[in-house]
Every structure is written in structure tokens, then in C-alpha cells.
């Protein structure tokens, strides 16, 4: 016999004049009220379990356009940082042996052009290690390395390298659970990526 039938039997007993003890009536009412009050709690709990389902969250995250854009940004930042590191340690970034000129220059101008291209092809760590130059090439080399624009370029490159490290780490931090809830997390990454692109 379920709760509803007990309640109906109690009401029918009252109508038919059947004596029902106060204890039995109170027990039936308490049982009914407890069942009715617990039903929304169970319903809300099942809804919450449905909402917090790990499979559902994983499906929403992996198919979200925002998540895909974040993954692309982090991987592109990692690729750019790898290229910056290669440029630092490379000895020959440009293949200047295959350069051909369509206009004949004097030997002095041609030497300066080749020296300039060679300096641009060197990594940051190998600029001051090259000593296999003739006197004219060494003068052109020193002229390039002592130029103020070259110093500005070095500072800019070092800043871009430092920001590349920070931005690459920052864009990979959202893969750690709980860090996306931090305030202004996305805005800081956006500002750093803009600064790196400006450099």
C-alpha cells in the first residue's frame, strides 16, 4: 500500500465514521509531506548531475569555437617561439650564396651588401663570434653592429623573445583545470599577444 492510498483511506475513514487514531493520521501526513518535500530535491540533484556530467562538459569544451580558437592561438604562439629560438642559435638564417644581382655594382657596394645579408642571417649569439672577414668586410661589419638601429633591433628582438616565452606559457595555462576562473585571465593574455605582435 502506497502513501496516497493510506491518505485516501484516512479521509474515507473520517467520512465513514471510522475512528483513526491521531498518531496514525500524523504519521501519514508526515510521510506524505516528507515525500513531497524530498521530490524537488531529488529532481534538482538529478538535473545538477546531468549538467555537471563530465562527458557533456568535455563535448561542450572540445566543440566550442572559443576553445578551438584558444588551442590554435596557443599552438601558433608555441611555433613562433620555436622560430625565435632557432633565429637566436642559427649560424646561417638566410642562404645568401644564391643571391644574384640583376644590376652590376662595384666591388665595394657588393661587399657591403653581402656583409649586410650575412649579418642578418646570423643568430643573436653568433654575431660577435664571426672573425673570418677581410679588412674591408670587418669595417662594414663593425659599421653595422655599432649602428644605433642595430642596437634597437637587438633590444626589440630580446623583448619579443621574452614576451614569447611568457605568452606561450600563459596560453598553455588554461589546460590546467581551475585557472580559467581567475579574474581577467583572458584579457591579460590578449594584451600580451598584442604586445608581442607589435614587437
From Swiss-Prot:
UniProt superkingdom: Eukaryota
One biological process term in Gene Ontology: cell differentiation
Disordered: region residues: 1-25
UniProt entry tagged with the keyword Transport: no
Membrane-spanning parts: 68-88, 109-128, 159-179
Modified residues (Phosphoserine): 53
Main function: Component of the outer dense fibers (ODF) of spermatozoa which could be involved in sperm tail structure, sperm movement and general organization of cellular cytoskeleton.
Protein name: Outer dense fiber protein 4
Organism the protein comes from: Bos taurus (Bovine)
Amino acid at each position: 500500500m502506497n502513501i496516497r492510498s493510506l491518505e485516501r483511506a484516512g479521509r474515507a475513514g473520517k467520512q465513514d465514521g471510522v475512528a483513526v487514531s491521531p498518531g496514525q493520521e500524523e504519521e501519514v501526513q508526515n510521510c506524505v509531506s516528507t515525500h513531497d518535500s524530498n521530490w524537488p530535491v531529488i529532481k534538482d540533484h538529478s538535473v545538477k548531475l546531468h549538467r555537471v556530467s563530465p562527458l557533456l562538459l568535455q563535448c561542450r569544451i572540445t566543440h566550442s569555437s572559443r576553445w578551438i580558437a584558444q588551442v590554435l592561438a596557443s599552438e601558433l604562439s608555441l611555433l613562433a617561439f620555436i622560430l625565435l629560438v632557432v633565429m637566436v642559435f642559427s649560424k646561417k638564417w638566410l642562404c645568401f650564396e644564391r643571391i644574384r644581382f640583376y644590376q652590376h655594382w662595384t666591388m665595394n657596394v657588393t661587399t657591403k651588401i653581402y656583409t649586410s645579408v650575412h649579418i642578418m642571417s646570423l643568430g643573436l649569439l653568433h654575431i660577435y663570434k664571426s672573425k673570418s672577414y677581410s679588412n674591408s668586410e670587418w669595417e662594414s661589419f663593425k659599421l653595422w653592429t655599432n649602428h644605433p638601429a642595430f642596437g634597437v633591433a637587438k633590444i626589440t628582438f630580446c623583448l619579443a623573445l621574452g614576451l614569447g616565452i611568457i605568452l606561450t606559457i600563459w596560453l598553455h595555462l588554461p589546460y590546467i583545470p581551475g585557472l580559467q576562473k581567475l579574474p581577467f585571465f583572458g584579457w591579460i593574455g590578449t594584451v600580451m599577444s598584442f604586445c608581442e605582435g607589435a614587437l
